[in-house]
Amino acid sequence: MAEAIFKQMEKDQTDYVYEDLRPIGKEEIESHFPHIVEHCKEKGYDVFKEPIPVVPAQHYFMGGIKVDYDSHTSMKHLYAIGETACNGVHGKNRLASNSLLESLVFAKRAAKDMTRKYEAPSMFDKTTLKLNVDPLILSALREDITSEDVSTCSVMRTAQLGEVELICKENGIIAGLQIFERTFKLLDEDVDVHFFAHDGDKVHKGELLAKVTGDMRTLLEGERTALNYLQRMSGIATYTRKVADLLEDTDIKLLDTRKTTPNNRIFEKYAVKVGGGSNHRYNLTDGVLLKDNHIGAAGSVTKAVQMARDYAPSVRKIEVEVETFDMVKEAVAAGADIIMLDNMSTELLKQSIDYIDKRAEIEISGNVTAENINRVKDMGVDFISSGALTHSAKILDLSLKNLHAINGRD
């Protein structure tokens, strides 16, 4: 209809068309459109006796502003819902007449997306940076710069101030901007990074995320290491968000595991939190998790739980990994606080959950991915852990482009 109106206006060389309300009937017009009747009367039009000139509002031409799953537009931090939004639920030709229920659903998603930035984990503090982060970044830089960057030294013999742009090449969730900046700062404290995004933001293909200014030699030497961190962390955050969104209508807490890249755990677990997941254990001192080999070493589930309580009485909770129904029964009898159901069939999961009957918290684990999490998310458990959040997430494609000298070249 909007297209037909637009074509008619083009044909008539006018900025309006005529709408005839008379076939509706006076009583119905007065009942349903009292404000239109009053407004037209003020302008000298009698809707009961003549057609009136009209033009569709801009969003009717557009079919609404295009939004994503969370009602987010292409403009940073701008959301659109209802008649202003084109969400694609009913196809690309759907105009702005979104239903109330549809609007409520997308409003809820928008609200949840807005609050994520306030729930995002804090960045690394100065102490953490100095003691835990900087040594890892410096080690990574030494992999690339053992003595000199021969390529850069070949074309840049002297210092020259320059600028390069951080460009997003695919849609995703950005994470690790502080580490990206820190990588350059460890090479040269005078490097300046101006960000146009924050950790946890949705970013889109072609979007400018940052401008980095400094000695061009430093920018060239540090770009690969800085991008490696940022791409890896953003990839994990993006995949975690995908999985977390599948659990949005549940109370389940999504957990990561210790299946991380050696020497990169601090970065990868931070990225999981940015994506909406939670950290399980950061390291072996964070809690008791009795797995199959611990149980084998102890002799039984019962002995393992008792030995753990005797050795670490201050530990708040003891978790036990089980693989069979007999192990489930033994873990419950032993007083395990959390029971991890590992690599179980759907039938065995249901049987085990029914048997536990809230006598312990329940975690499901074992090859859980975005593709199969729907199989277990409605079983009434407390946690779902997924090693895939860190070991199977692909990088987010990002690039440093358009390096150029500032104020000419010496």
Question: What is each PLM-predicted segment?
Answer:
Residues 4-10, 60, 66-80, 84-128, ...:
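Glycine- and aromatic-enriched mobile tails/lids
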Residues 24-26, 59-60, 66, 72, ...:
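Short, glycine-/Ser/Thr-/acidic-enriched flexible segments
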Residues 1-50:
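An anion/pyrophosphate-binding glycine-rich loop and adjacent beta-alpha core
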Residues 35-78:
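FAD/FMN-dependent oxidoreductases across multiple families
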Residues 81, 341-342, 362-368, 386-388:
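Glycine-rich beta-strand-to-loop/alpha-helix junction loops that act as flexible
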Residues 123-321, 326-334, 338, 347, ...:
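Acidic/glycine-rich phosphate/pyrophosphate-binding loops and surrounding catalytic core
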Residues 19-30, 52, 64, 93, ...:
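Hydrophobic alpha-helical scaffolding
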Residues 388-410:
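Short, charged, intrinsically disordered terminal tails
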